[in-house]
Swiss-Prot record:
InterPro entries: KdpA. Keywords: Cell inner membrane, Cell membrane, Ion transport, Membrane, Potassium, Potassium transport, Transmembrane, Transmembrane helix, Transport. It is found in: Cell inner membrane. The system is composed of three essential subunits: KdpA, KdpB and KdpC. This is Potassium-transporting ATPase potassium-binding subunit. It comes from Shigella flexneri. The gene is kdpA. One of its GO terms (cellular component) is plasma membrane.
Length: 557
């Protein structure tokens, strides 16, 4: 079993790096504001039609463009879900959503979280899924990538005030990266057996003689961008464990690759754009070390079996509860870590049924800010915040003004970095405390034990860090939970983007200083260790007390 697990992890990472490298080169061209071959004419036409200016923006203008697009998308999706029953492509005549569920769902998909307090096949029409959720899957992913584009430019430009043009970046990211790659993935899913139709639900007779209603719909097209954009919201309630979404072991492997593809490619692009590929490799090493350790822990915990069943004398040599038999323990464990290391949230197994330690690792990966590969764009700018913090700590230890890539890190940047890092832990801890203090919060718990607290902590961690997965024992479709989680998702997304853009605006105006003998190397194993230590230290200090009340207490009981 250990050899199989090692081979699975090694194969996954090897294929990932091979695919991400060329994509990283393409992203580097876009960051450097170089149109891809044959696209310049199309771009000019698309900008001329709506009269959009392609002039460069400062950080405030860039931020306002991103926020404005997302707020418009939020309003459109909210009213679309409310009035779903008036819109076409609704063969099952599904009614509109309640205001609180519509708000939660709209915020969820606009913020790239894709938390779902509903069952897709019994709640949403084809039009809502396709014109509402799938569109936001593209736009939310493009928004995150655009922010990291601007942030990277802050290190490569000197004594400037502009970070690029948000509309140009959004157009190029969507048309030349997300749409083509998602199209290829969708066609592959269809070839493998994923659904793509607009038929009414089909009544069939099962082998037992009973009748069953099979849901239909345009699944493959949504599934592709759901994974590529680290969105994660499933067309069906069972998400990627449903055979209509994820029909074969090969589609499952491609789905895991798609989740990590753009976050990995962005690391390669970062190294290429800064002129020092070692910087990108440093980030990949730090992410990969944490990732491999976490996968190993989850695999070990799940292979041990369920201790409660073992205590009762039942056969539980491995923990198969909540897992698809066609995928098994090792693949389910790998997928769980992939989907929570990135801000995806898609699942092929129920995380609520993992062992105490097996479920704690995905929860902790979200709590440290989704920086281990992370979401498209958001993962890298989240990790870059920890890079700045690590550089600052190192500067304090050696008595020098901290600098990174030649840019001095001053008080303003550190205050904004601390603010951005503290946003999500504050939301998680205060949100969980509020839920446990109120009857409306506690009544949603399936279990009154430490595992019940873990369900609450997982839900708020998932929402605040824009992941979207859940310990599904929590009954979250209530006004209290829909509003609480919507607030956490909204602030967790834009409360980090705003200081990140402010940091970019500050750094882009500075001159780049040449490296000297006292400059801290930020590309070697020493800095990789320092960066990993910084991530672990912040995560440990912030969440160990809360984790001790949930999964740790469950493990020891």
């Amino acid at each position: 079993m250990a050899a199989q697990g090692f081979l699975l992890i090694a194969t996954f990472l090897l294929v990932l790096m091979v695919l991400a490298r060329p994509l990283g080169s393409g992203l580097a061209r876009l960051i450097n504001d170089i149109p891809l071959p044959g696209t310049a004419g199309v771009e000019r036409i698309l900008f001329r039609l709506p009269g959009v200016s392609d002039h460069e923006m400062n950080w405030k203008q860039y931020l306002c463009a991103i926020l404005g697009l997302n707020m418009l998308g939020l309003a459109v999706l909210f009213f679309m879900l409310l009035g779903q029953h008036y819109l076409p492509l609704n063969p099952q005549q599904l009614p509109g959503l309640s205001w609180d569920l519509a708000l939660n769902t709209a915020v969820s998909f606009v913020t790239n979280t894709n938390w779902q307090s509903y069952s897709g096949e019994t709640t949403l029409s084809y039009f809502s899924q396709m014109a509402g959720l799938t569109v936001q899957n593209f736009l939310s992913a493009a928004s995150g990538i655009a922010v990291i584009f601007a942030f990277i430019r802050a290190f490569t430009r000197q004594s400037m005030s502009t970070l690029g043009n948000a509309w140009v970046d959004l157009l190029r990211i969507t048309l030349w990266v997300l749409v083509p790659v998602a199209l290829l993935i969708a066609l592959f899913f269809i070839q493998q057996g994923a659904q793509q139709n607009f038929l009414p639900y089909q009544a069939v007779n099962t082998v037992e003689g009973a009748q069953q209603l099979l849901p239909m719909g345009p699944v493959a097209s949504q599934e592709a961008i759901k994974m590529l954009g680290t969105n994660g919201g499933g067309f069906f309630n069972a998400n990627s464990s449903h055979p209509f979404e994820n029909p074969t072991a090969l589609t499952n492997f491609v789905q895991m690759l798609a989740i990590f593809l753009i976050p990995t490619a962005l690391c390669f692009a970062f190294g290429e754009v800064t002129g020092d590929r070692r910087q990108g490799r440093m980030l990949l090493w730090a992410m990969s070390v944490i990732f491999v350790i976490c996968v190993g822990v989850v695999m070990w915990a799940e292979v041990q079996g369920n201790p409660h069943l073992l205590a009762l004398g039942a056969d539980s040599s491995i923990n198969m509860e909540g897992k698809e038999s066609r995928f098994g323990v090792l693949v389910s464990s790998l997928f769980a870590v992939v989907t929570t290391a990135a801000s995806c949230g898609a699942v092929i197994a129920m995380h609520d049924s993992f062992t105490a330690l097996g479920g704690m690792v995905p929860m902790w990966l979200m709590q440290i800010g989704e920086v281990v590969f992370g979401g498209v764009g958001s993962g890298l700018y989240g990790m870059m915040l920890f890079v700045l913090l690590a550089v600052f700590i190192a500067g304090l230890m050696i008595g020098r003004t901290p600098e990174y890539l030649g840019k001095k890190i001053d008080v303003r940047e550190m205050k904004l970095t601390a603010l951005a890092i503290l946003v999500t832990p504050t939301l998680v801890l205060m949100g969980a405390a509020l839920a446990m203090m109120t009857d409306a919060g506690r009544s949603a718990m399936l279990n009154p034990s430490p595992h019940g607290f873990s369900e609450v902590l997982y839900a708020v961690s998932s929402a605040a860090n824009n992941n979207g997965s859940a310990f599904a024992g929590l009954s979250a479709n209530s006004p209290f939970w829909n509003c609480l989680l919507a607030f956490c998702m909204f602030v967790g997304r834009f409360g980090v983007i705003i200081p990140v853009m402010a940091i970019a605006g500050s750094l882009v105006s500075k001159k780049s200083q040449p490296a000297s003998s006292g400059t801290l190397p930020t590309h070697g194993p020493l800095f990789v260790g320092l960066l990993i230590g910084t991530v672990l230290l912040v995560g440990a200090l912030t969440f160990i007390p809360a984790l001790a009340l949930g999964p740790v207490a469950e493990y020891l009981s």
